Amino acid sequence: MSEQIVTSEIITPVVPDKNGKINLLDLNRQQMREFFKELGEKPFRADQVMKWMYHYCSDNFDEMTDINKVLRGKLKEVAEIRAPEVVEEQRSSDGTIKWAIAVGDQRVETVYIPEDDRATLCVSSQVGCALECKFCSTAQQGFNRNLRVSEIIGQVWRAAKIVGAAKVTGQRPITNVVMMGMGEPLLNLTNVVPAMEIMLDDFGFGLSKRRVTLSTSGVVPALDKLGDMIDVALAISLHAPNDEIRDEIVPINRKYNIETFLDAVRRYLQKSNANQGRVTIEYVMLDHINDGTEHAHQLAELLKDTPCKINLIPWNPFPGAPYGRSSNSRIDRFSKVLMSYGFTTIVRKTRGDDIDAACGQLAGDVIDRTKRTLRKRMQGEAIDIKAV
């Protein structure tokens, strides 16, 4: 086996859980080897345990039969393998599965999307989101905290456990992971990067770097750091052809405008092999907001110096949202303009919208620390009083 191992400089502090045990899902391979060294064991023991954890989805040390009984007993005293639990499952008519995952006293959502030739898992990185993109349900829930490594990789582990571990079924239960669930991944680099390293590691889930995708709304300093830490596929949530529109629907644009964002994207592409020289542009289609043919021409001009493919995403509604979904005819005209400029343009097929599992619909259960939901409720009450 050709080893793919941790290369980043991030070392997340390993903190025992309340029961005093180390959750091994919090450790990448470098940390696992250090942990076993502290136990007086050889580094290869870490590799053996990781193989059981991720290839077999085992959380029981007694199942690890190539490890001696004394070491298994020692591990049970000081460590555990504890992934977050599924507390609710919903299945779509198209085969998509949405899991509500308990993280402490809150919930995040994880989505499994099976297709004929692949199975993609959409993973959350935060409880809620601080960025307030106006068309996204998650953003309306407010923000509470970053997820730990074990809570991020634990979503992949739990999904693989449910669908069937690779060594049990003989097939990969998950072929692609997209960091496109709840939260902005670049605002949680300390935990997201080690989790992605486990996804890529041969003794982890062994995914190709082209099959692990991080999506960002444009936290430019963190994007520059990412390029020095790990090489994964990159998707960017652009959603507008100019700063005027993006300032309104993606507020972080007021801090890092489109030009600044795309400059950072091009810097990342220069460092990356995973992207095959181009980035994926995500563009949600909002009726009569950003979906006119004039917007398509502006977008083509904007992206002329950025190697990319463009995903057009029909907007998925949620209660209280002030937008409408673009009609098929408007999306078609928009797409044809982009293709006339030579851009690879794909209209994303909506999956799981009947269970609110589609793009922009994930909500979870968030104890909002930003007071955003309270402000919105008070504003709503004020409007109602005025209307009366």
UniProtKB/Swiss-Prot annotation:
Signal peptide: none annotated. InterPro entries: Aldolase_TIM, Methyltransferase_A, RlmN_N, RNA_MTrfase_RlmN, rRNA_lsu_MTrfase_RlmN/Cfr, rSAM. Residues 115-354 form the Radical SAM core domain. Its cofactor is [4Fe-4S] cluster. It comes from the Bacteria. Its EC number is 2.1.1.192. It is found in: Cytoplasm. Binds 1 [4Fe-4S] cluster. The cluster is coordinated with 3 cysteines and an exchangeable S-adenosyl-L-methionine. [4Fe-4S] cluster binds at residues 129, 133, 136. Specifically methylates position 2 of adenine 2503 in 23S rRNA and position 2 of adenine 37 in tRNAs. m2A2503 modification seems to play a crucial role in the proofreading step occurring at the peptidyl transferase center and thus would serve to optimize ribosomal fidelity. This is Dual-specificity RNA methyltransferase RlmN. It comes from Citrobacter koseri (strain ATCC BAA-895 / CDC 4225-83 / SGSC4696).
